[in-house]
């Protein structure tokens, strides 16, 4: 599992006040962390577990106590969890088209992360986009 927000550095002028403290120097919050699967987990389950069990690459004081912060809400209409923020970086924090997206093995699934069942060996990346995914390689 990898969590990255390096696109923010290309759009730093749009970043909301007070959010600079949560940006890792490298732009990477978690770097290729392995998560043990028992079978049937979703991409959401994996990211949640990775955040609970690890600290960020900067080993910041915010993560030392409880792991990497992650906030999400359940959306009944889509029967899915929506990731609002990771490491205190939330959707719309870097412009109106910013937020979190995920890819599995380099592809962006057409379904929410809690609907996508992962397999052992999958490479899961949660990336912060500042431009509806175009800046991270997701072109509709």
Tell where the protein language model's regions lie, with residue ranges.
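Ubiquitin-like/PB1-type beta-grasp interaction modules and other compact soluble beta-rich domains
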Residues: 1-140
């Amino acid at each position: 599992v990898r969590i990255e927000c390096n696109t923010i550095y290309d759009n730093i002028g749009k970043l909301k006040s007070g959010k600079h403290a949560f940006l890792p120097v490298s732009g990477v919050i978690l770097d290729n962390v392995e998560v043990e699967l028992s079978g049937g987990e979703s991409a959401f389950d994996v990211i949640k577990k990775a955040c609970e069990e690890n600290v960020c690459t900067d080993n910041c004081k915010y993560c030392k106590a409880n792991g990497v912060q992650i906030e999400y809400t359940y959306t009944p209409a889509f029967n899915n969890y929506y990731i609002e923020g990771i490491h205190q970086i939330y959707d719309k924090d870097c412009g109106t088209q910013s937020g979190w997206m995920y890819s599995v093995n380099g592809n962006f699934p057409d379904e929410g992360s809690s609907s996508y069942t992962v397999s052992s060996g999958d490479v899961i990346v949660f990336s912060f986009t500042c431009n509806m995914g175009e800046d991270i390689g997701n072109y509709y």
